Amino acid sequence: MLVSATEMLKKAKAGHYAVGQFNINNLEWTKSILLTAQECNSPVILGVSEGAGKYMAGYKTVVGMVNGMLEELKITVPVALHLDHGSYEGCLKCVEAGFSSIMFDGSHYPIEENVAKTKELVKICAEHNMSLEAEVGSIGGEEDGVVGMGECADPNECKMIADLGIDFLAAGIGNIHGKYPANWQGLSFETLDAIQKLTGDMPLVLHGGTGIPADMIKIAIDLGVSKTNVNTECQLSFAAATREYIEAGKDQQGKGYDPRKLLAPGAEAIKATVKEKMELFGSVNKA
């Protein structure tokens, strides 16, 4: 059964570890992540961007697939199904479809409008026993076509949004989506520390977990990050394993072209990446 992410992230904050949000793109992604979470006895958050939701035919299809897998793969660890970087309209659709958690990305609105829309969603999520993530300061890189520069959020704006009744907060601290450029300045721990001091027990979220050095992630977790998002790294490992299979000509041996065989190395590569991240975040055996 799907659960909201609130409880698992409160536990993570208190226990000084982070729960991974791993974005799903199809059946292979979802199955690989769920099986690894079960194997590692770790709570997990399945992230769905609006683009990925559309690709998988729609949010109801995603909910049906995930619920079916939870039952038939006998998954017993806590699993949240979370809309990643949702528009206001996308959030409402996910509430209706049966997601257990949503992120409202109002970072491109003026702060007053971001506050007003966040307040409405706080009320809706409370009625549906769902968790709500909000964002302050745009995260850099590209997320479904939206490009941000990796700015640092204003800690006072973070407090204003945190006080609205959301469950966890994503704040820009110099992090970006996708591959990090060679001239990246690193995470601003000063900003993170200031946000943590103003928001107290609020679990904080680190977007763009791919490419951030392990030591920086560990410091961020010590400073209050309880949820770390990973997407690009799983995509890269899946692509590399699939390329290796095809370049070795394995798709031309016997029935190697069968999609179940063709996609198997990529699925195994996702499992290995997810396990490595769960160990880094400290969530193994925390289910």
Task: Please provide the spans of the model-predicted regions.
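Short catalytic-loop micro-motif centered on adjacent basic/acidic residues
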Residues: 19-23, 81-82, 103, 204-207, ...
